[in-house]
Structures are given as structure tokens and as C-alpha cells.
Amino acid sequence: MPAREKIGVVVSNKMQKTVVVAVENRVAHPKYGKIVVKTKKFKAHDEENRCQEGDLVRITETRPLSRTKRWRVAEIIREVKKL
């Protein structure tokens, strides 16, 4: 069974070797049918501390690395401009 993958935006990189990635999911409201954007945050392992806030990244599921960390940064799709 292949590992699950998600694409999201880095919202925090304040921890060492860890980033927080916000993943958006669009679902229809069960009763009214309106499309609602739901956001979920995942902690992901970033071994080289390469990710910056605002980067678009792909994360893959992995074995538990800590109490809350079960994802790993697979690649940086789009980097934010550095000042």
C-alpha cells in the first residue's frame, strides 16, 4: 500500500527540523450543498530545515517520529521569495 500524500502551505517553521503544514480540503455541505473550505494542520519532518513560511510542499505519511509528527516533507513544490 503506497504512503498517502498531501499538498499544503508551510505556516510555521519555528521548531527545529519540524514544519507545520496547512492542507485545504474543499467539501460540499451535506445539507445545503455549498462548497466549504476546511483546513487541517499537520506537523511534518524537515531534516535540513529548508522550508520557509509560505512554501508549497508535498508531504508523505511515515512512521511516527514523535507524539504528533507522522508526516515527512517529500519535496518543496514552490519556494517563497527570500528577502
UniProtKB/Swiss-Prot annotation:
Q: Can you provide one Gene Ontology molecular function annotated for this UniProt record?
A: structural constituent of ribosome
Q: Which UniProt keywords apply?
A: Ribonucleoprotein, Ribosomal protein, RNA-binding, rRNA-binding
Q: Which PROSITE patterns match?
A: RIBOSOMAL_S17
Q: Which domain of life is it from?
A: Bacteria
Q: Which Gene3D superfamilies match?
A: Nucleic acid-binding proteins
* GO CC list: cytosolic small ribosomal subunit
SUPFAM superfamilies with a match to the protein in the record = Nucleic acid-binding proteins (SSF50249)
Q: Which GO BP terms sit in this record?
A: translation
Subunit architecture: Part of the 30S ribosomal subunit.
Q: Which family does it belong to?
A: Belongs to the universal ribosomal protein uS17 family.
> Function of this protein?
One of the primary rRNA binding proteins, it binds specifically to the 5'-end of 16S ribosomal RNA.
Q: Return the protein name.
A: Small ribosomal subunit protein uS17
Species source reads Synechococcus sp. (strain JA-3-3Ab)
This protein's encoding gene: rpsQ
